[in-house]
Amino acid sequence: MDESEVRAPLPGAVVGVLVSEGELVSAGCTLLVLEVMKMEHPVTAEASGTVTSVLVAAGASVAAGDLLLTIAAGEVAAGEQAMDAVIDLDGAPRADLAEVFARRLFLADDSPARVERVSARHARGHRTVRENIAALFDDSSFEEWGGFAVAAQQARRDVRELIERTPADGMVAGIGRVGGRPVAVAGYDYLVLAGTQGTRNHMKKDRLFEIVERLSLPVVLFAEGGGGRPGDTDYAVIAGLDTMAFALFARLSGLVPTVGIANGYCFAGNAALLGCCDLVIATEDASIGMGGPAMIEGGGLGVFSPAEVGPISVQSPNGVVDVVAAGDVEAVEIAQRYLSYFAGPSPDWHCQDQRLLRHLVPERRTTIYDVHQVIETLLDTGSLLELRPEFGIGIVTALGRIEGRPVGLIANNPAHLGGAIDSDAADKAARHVQLCDAYDLPVVSLCDTPGFMVGPDAEASAQVRHFSRMFVTAASATVPYVTVVLRKGYGLGAQAMAGGSFHACLLTISWPTGEFGGMGLEGAVRLAWRRELEQITDEEERQALYDKLVASLYERGRALSMATHFEIDDVIDPAETRRRIVHVLAAAPPAPDRRGHKKRPFVDTW
């Protein structure tokens, strides 16, 4: 009868012998266990048979190759074979996995420790941060990082309490997909210590933002919360000013699209991160401030309720908030739409009958019109997202699509100051061009301006500096830039709308209603013919000459006259506007893949 030897595969200590002499064993069954470097290694039978000798006992030390036991080869009846353990895939999990499952339950909104607070939040009309994140991402695509972290307060609170009351240390972070594309999220959980910034949730942000930079992922930040948390005790911290989260997040500006959502109270550090975002969305009941009520009172500046500090009635007209949403449901939908503009063309699009454009600018040159109607007709139906609509209202800034292609848009608003560009409007337009250039969105400019705003009040706003930002920003941009003159194109204001010059754009075209001049016609007449007008004593005669001179300049500056002198590229049927824009954008080379590389150092927060 053949006899096989079983030898030690490694040097170690025998911690258990599982068979005895005369015992029947089957191939693959465990005979004994060796401990090597504090790890247990099973020694198994290579063939079936009967154990004929056992040469070691528990506690023995063996060298590699030492003989452990012998087995006489032979068939083992089915009923006598040592049966391997049967794995029950549907049975109860083993203890270590069960512990993980049990711990994960504390992260859910239906955890007993959270149910009451979740109900109270729902009663206020708000979703939880986890509900918002679930709504943001494609179904089942979100994977959380750092969910088992708890507040660093074990020196003052029981660990069990921290697990129940501070899940994820109040910061839900991870990666999912929006519209099929990977997106990162960092969401403060207001149900955990009022969404404050704890030691470990700072660590989680640091980790996430580093991964975001490495993978070039867009980021959505749910910023609701009260700022820094002084109650963490488990780390020796004096001021915590070495926290990297703010620097890491700011470094993403211009690298990847960043979206911030403020719902409810957003103060201090939470607000600082929000302000770093390319797009700031806030709900109607949000309050946003660099200092909350406690800081204000502590500074001896008065006592205020949270709702009195940075309400939307302040933060939207002053330009802090880009888009105001009715609630967090709409806020998440806006974030999804915003991210879609950076995901490439959409194959499905529709538009209004473009012949409507022929009738939206009145024939009478002094009659105002709603430029929003022009924008909505020109863009693909339902694709318009206007940014900062209550700030700098002399210029409309928006994102949209033309034949499915994402574009950025700036447009003078003739209903405000006749379309004149003031300081706020200039800042708003310059920042929007930066945003579009950073992420390679072509810019379409709809020009109808008498120029920049003039007068002592305008200059008191530091207009010289603000207005010049439009020139400097456009000169540094490399995205395709198309200017369409709807009516007025006068002076430096018109040049600024065209990126610095009518020949700085890829294409400058005008509708038949276009009128042009080096400055406003009325001002030009009063300046150039002042002496002649002053010499006429009869008011009617003076007015008649004035009207004649204005009419002469108007005729000279008509769109067809400008095209005749080739100061613009063409005068077109307004119904052809989309086609001409699409044609020139198609001729431009595609933007290179910039993942991991910035085109601009950052996108101005203002």
Residue ranges and their predicted role:
Residues M1-V14, T30-S48, F249-R251:
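Short beta-strand-turn/beta-hairpin segments enriched in glycine/proline and small hydrophobics
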Residues P9, G16-L24, A47-S48, T52-A57:
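Short histidine-centered loop motifs in beta-beta connectors
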Residues E23-T44, A63-E80:
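Short hydrophobic beta/alpha edge segments that flank linear recognition/processing sites
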Residues T44-T52, E75-A92:
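Short, compositionally biased
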Residues A57-A73, E576-A586:
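A contiguous, mid-protein "functional segment" used to position or interact
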Residues Q81-W606:
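Ligand-binding clefts of soluble mixed alpha/beta catalytic domains
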